[in-house]
Amino acid sequence: MKIVVGEGSCGIAAGAAKVYSAIEKLIGLTGSTLTVTGCIGMCFLEPIVDIYDGGELKKRLVKVRPEDAEKIIAYVNGDENAVNDIEISDEDKLFLKKQTRIALRHCGIINPEIIDEYTAFDGYRALEKVLKTMTPEDVIEEIKISGLAGRGGAGFPTWFKWNAARQSQGETKYLICNADEGDPGAFMDRAVIESDPHNLIEGMLIGAYAIGAKEAVVYVRAEYPLAIERLKEAIKQAEEKGFLGENIMGMGFSCKMRIKAGAGAFVCGEETALIESLQGERGMPRLKPPFPAQSGYWYKPSNINNVETFANVSWIILNGGEAFAAMGTDGSKGTKVFALTGKIKRGGLVEIPMGKTLRDVIFDIGGGIKNGKKFKAVQMGGPSGGCIPADLLDTVIDYKALGATGAIMGSGGMVVMDETTCMVSMAQFFLDFTAKESCGKCIHCRIGTKRMLEILNRIVKGEGREGDIELLEELCYSIKDGALCGLGQTAPNPVLTTIKYFRNEYEAHINDKKCPAKSCPDLLEYTIDADKCRGCTLCAKKCPANAISGEVKSAHKIDRDKCIKCGSCVSVCRFGAVNVD
């Protein structure tokens, strides 16, 4: 048997490395082998251990602890019931069962550090097919047939960008992978690089062949050390096997590849800002035109796509563009990967065909909302996206339908919110992020987001004024019309969508000085119900501000002047005696 421990960043953070070490100490007692894999996407169940027998998955064990190693060894030694208590439930199996995986097809299956495991799953066969039987024009046509659009957020046709770079005059051309995944709560690209780096390399090589580039660069944020480490090893192995470098596969095509670690600036997700950073300059967007296809890296013709876009390419070449186009909707083909996070039961990586609804993802795959709470909204597209309310849960997931709601597909962030989430505070959070991440080049983004944030800060503190909502809307449209790049133009989206769908919450904050979600501390008042209080003194002992007084077995009181509204009393009271209004 083969024991496989999931060691993506999520698994390691949950303790997978310790689980691996515990099993390693005992594995000698069996005839089994022990290896690692990347993230299969079920982050809510990490650490995960899979047990294979003859290539067939026999057991998937979840939330495994180091002390469970003895159970695992007992199972592989013949005790069929040894791991029953840590085996995945039938309900949680639905998380993967209801997905369609193309970009993530190898994630959590192969060892990302061993190239032979990738080639065993048809790895580099697409590259071989391209070099042996297809011209660059053939490749671009196949991508056109597939309908593959850029998965970084803009949804621009991939074939069009490749063709523009192909047609540009110049001896030197560059292919660049944008792995600068900066959206809060997004981890799709990180998982692909950590779990299936050779798929990224193969997709990039096919793209380089198509546009005529002899050098490829992966721009990845420095905050992804494991992804960088595994990608470096994958590049080294690909070079040793003749899949990368000079005269690839003996077919006369040469392309070298290197990694550039970025400093983590959100604006460097914008392609021209990324290029500036690659050149050693401050990451600030360039004016377009010219576009990178005409004048990009070092002012040479360049093509930029993100990780997920490249991760689809080898599958399309092997299976045909028509097979990819058969999935999805008329305007949005294929599958899309989402990072499902927030107040959700089953959070992790989800890949579904375009055309599924938000309800399909959040409730059928994600299992619905934690702790019996009600679904309130979902934030799509990160800081550049928008909030979609519960009555639009049946919105189809494609570029046009999501755009009609005021949100965007984005790179794939999907943050789920329940009834305890304040939408004004949510807008404040995302605007605070974009204001800090603004490169400062244009006034609309640099100053406009700051003024908007000042208004939101006042509102959540109970200092909102009549006319603030209208002023926010005016600033939003001014920034959208005047900002230079996509970051600035989309920065107002979280504010606009929360005003559109949750205007009543803004009005409650401004007019009534109340937070309907009971989330904004400055608008809350803590009191103790004398009839329910048992005088156990636990709340008084836990209060960091010494704001609670009272005798043992007598009703306690909260001093409003001292109360810092931290919520400690609510969390420790076993009798529901603390009221929050």
Protein language model features and the residues they cover:
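Ferredoxin-type iron-sulfur electron-transfer modules in oxidoreductases and energy-metabolism complexes
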Residues: 1, 16-36, 53-78, 126-143, ...
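Conserved phosphate/anionic-ligand binding catalytic regions in large, soluble enzymes, centered on
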Residues: 7-12, 144-165, 264-276, 435-447, ...
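Iron-sulfur cluster-binding cysteine motifs and their immediate structural context
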Residues: 47-51, 444-450, 538-557, 568-581
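Flexible inter-domain linker/hinge segments
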Residues: 84-145, 305-320
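Gly-rich Lys/Arg/Thr-decorated short loops/hinges at beta-loop-alpha junctions or inter-strand turns
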Residues: 110, 115-125, 175-189, 292-298, ...
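Short amphipathic, charge-patterned alpha-helical segments
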Residues: 203-205, 354-370
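Hydrophobic alpha-helical positions that pack around
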Residues: 228-354, 366
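C-terminal accessory/binding modules appended to enzymatic or scaffolding proteins
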Residues: 334-346, 352-354, 358, 516-560, ...
